[in-house]
Amino acid sequence: MKISCVLGKLLMLFELIHGLQDLSITCSESWLQVKLRRTPLLNDLQPLQNELSLGIGCPVNMVEVDFFGFLYLLTFCGIRVSEHGVGILIESLIVYEPTNFDFNLHIPVSCYVQRRFPIILVMRGRENDSRRECRRSVGQHRSLSHELEDLEIRPRVSYVNSVPLLSYLIVSLPKCKNKAVHSG
């Protein structure tokens, strides 16, 4: 009796693994979407909407002609989020509770999101010039381009994912005291 039960579960596992091409997983840094094709999962039985859940009891919330779908924020359903240096690993499972059987099937799902890194301003100091003061006459106005030249900020274009981004390379920023010099 135990052997037939084990063989039955192994057969179900094989059928599930073979049918995983019917599973679509999409994710972002804040949500997880899983679509399961409406095909028989076990013994030619097609799952019903109320027999499927994501994680800890989150029901199907998208019903399409060919798919059952789950779309939830990562803070729901007991979805596990593991943050790594370069990305986020998102893990959960689909629980299939067939009404005709005394056991549940668990289909693991996982998704990886690569982090987007922000533009970083890099500062490089100059030797023997850290005490430079900014001086300008009272009432003298300067354009932004002149201010940038004085601060030696040079714009450059970098390409990330084939999209040009404008970033600034800061060569040095003098420590300025807001002092005005009266020209007399």
From Swiss-Prot:
<comment type="similarity">
    <text>Belongs to the PLAC1 family.</text>
</comment>
<dbReference type="InterPro" id="IPR033222">
    <property type="entry name" value="PLAC1_fam"/>
</dbReference>
<feature type="signal peptide">
    <location>
        <begin position="1"/>
        <end position="19"/>
    </location>
</feature>
<keyword id="KW-0732">Signal</keyword>
<keyword id="KW-0964">Secreted</keyword>
<keyword id="KW-0325">Glycoprotein</keyword>
<feature type="glycosylation site" description="N-linked (GlcNAc...) asparagine">
    <location>
        <position position="128"/>
    </location>
</feature>
<protein>
    <recommendedName>
        <fullName>Oocyte-secreted protein 4A</fullName>
    </recommendedName>
</protein>
<dbReference type="GO" id="GO:0005576">
    <property type="term" value="C:extracellular region"/>
</dbReference>
